[in-house]
Design a protein with these regions (language model features):
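Short, solvent-exposed coil/turn elements at secondary-structure transition points
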Residues: 18-19, 49, 85, 107
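Conserved catalytic cores of phosphodiester-cleaving nucleases, focusing on short active-site segments
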Residues: 28-54, 58-63, 79
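Domain-level recognition of nuclease-like catalytic cores that cleave nucleotide substrates
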Residues: 77-122
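Alpha-helix boundary/capping detector
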Residues: 23, 30, 70, 84, ...
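Alpha-helix termination/capping residues and helix-transition junctions
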Residues: 38, 73-74
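Amphipathic, low-proline, heptad-repeat alpha-helices and/or compositionally biased low-complexity charged/polar-rich
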Residues: 1-7
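Short, charged, amphipathic alpha-helix that recurs within catalytic cores of restriction-modification
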Residues: 54-72, 78-85, 89
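Active-site metal-binding core of divalent-cation-utilizing nuclease and nuclease-like domains
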Residues: 8-37
């Protein structure tokens, strides 16, 4: 959570969020957001080994987010994949899709994005 608060100005970090609405459910590994001037929300998906369906899963969560959390409709929404191990081609695919990549090593969370990275706001 330190990297989320220091890098993105996040005020609230909530792990393991589960929500049900109209017979549907959504599970988030981490929901982080700020209501202050940054006014953004970040969904963090944690994977030990990134596979192609992991990228698709996060994109689906990002697309459904506002249906389940209308109270955050005014926020810019970003995705972060936090992984222990990711093949370079999948890492590049996620970055090209505008998803932040973070590495997990010894329980440390570190952003791994190139200087020219352009995140996508959903």
């Amino acid at each position: 959570s330190k990297i989320l608060t220091e890098t993105f100005g996040i005020e609230v970090v909530t792990p393991r969020v589960k929500v049900r609405k109209a017979g549907r459910s959504l599970e988030l590994d981490v929901l982080a957001y700020a209501n202050s001037e940054c006014n953004a929300a970040y969904i963090v998906e944690i994977k030990s080994h990134l596979r192609p369906d992991g990228i698709e899963q996060l994109q689906n969560i990002l697309e459904q987010f506002r249906t389940f959390f209308p109270e955050h409709a005014d926020k810019a929404l970003y995705g972060i994949l936090a992984v222990v191990d990711a093949p370079e081609d999948l890492r590049q695919e996620a970055l090209s899709a505008g998803i932040f990549m973070a590495g997990i090593n010894d329980e440390q969370f570190k952003l791994e994005v190139p200087k020219n990275f352009q995140p996508k706001a959903w």
